[in-house]
Amino acid sequence: MNEGVHGEIHVADPSICRVSEASKETAVESVSRSVGATGDTAAVEFTAPSSAAIDDADEIFHHEQKTIYRVTHSFTEESRCACELIEGHGCPVRHLEADCGAVVLSFVAADLESFRDIVVNLKSAFDGVSLRRLTQSEPDSATGSLVFVDRDELTARQREVLETAHEMGYFEHPREANATEVAAALDINRSTFTEHLSAAQSKLLDTILDV
């Protein structure tokens, strides 16, 4: 059996896409993406409160105080998004969400080496790339590749942020707590929480993937 790797990546770069920009100002739900029939355009749809002021997106549906918006763009090197980069490696994006100006994407790579290549390319194209979850298929044989993580690589504050986020269900699907709620539990503001979490995840990602 192929030792596939299921990864979930957090990208905090504000330039990544229009949906991430919208999520800075309001709650964004139900993000979906599709490629046009000609293969040179993509459309992204997301749901947000109708009261939100969202520019540069077409309103396509409205119901019960919520509006579905659509953003369409052509594929160019200048406007290439993280989804296109990942799919360029032959890995469809399985899950996409936006929160607090960042996006979370999940995909399955054929093996750890392929996953590492995608992450390296993401990190070269965008700032604030960090690992949220990494699951590897159980191999048919008992042999495996163990990775030892030195907890001392993380500061005490970074460990506290990770542990609190985990305990409160921040990494669950669907989330049991959002960034604002976890930050409140830690008695810090949301931007500080995001900064500590991103730094901790980046250190773990570098260790696990050896990049």
Curated annotation (Swiss-Prot):
Keywords from the named record? Activator, DNA-binding, Plasmid, Transcription, Transcription regulation
State if Nucleotidyltransferase is listed as a keyword.
no
User: Ranges for the HTH bat-type domain?
Assistant: 154-205
Function of the molecule? Activates transcription of the denitrifying genes (nitrate reductase narA and nitrite reductase nirK) under anaerobic conditions.
Origin: domain of life: Archaea
| Alphabetical list of Gene3D superfamilies matching this protein | Winged helix-like DNA-binding domain superfamily/Winged helix DNA-binding domain
- Phenotype when changing C100S: Normal growth under denitrifying conditions. Normal growth under aerobic conditions
In Swiss-Prot or TrEMBL terms, this protein is called: Transcriptional regulator NarO
Q: Name one GO molecular function term.
A: DNA binding
TM stretches of this protein: none
Biological process terms in GO annotation: cellular response to nitrate; positive regulation of DNA-templated transcription
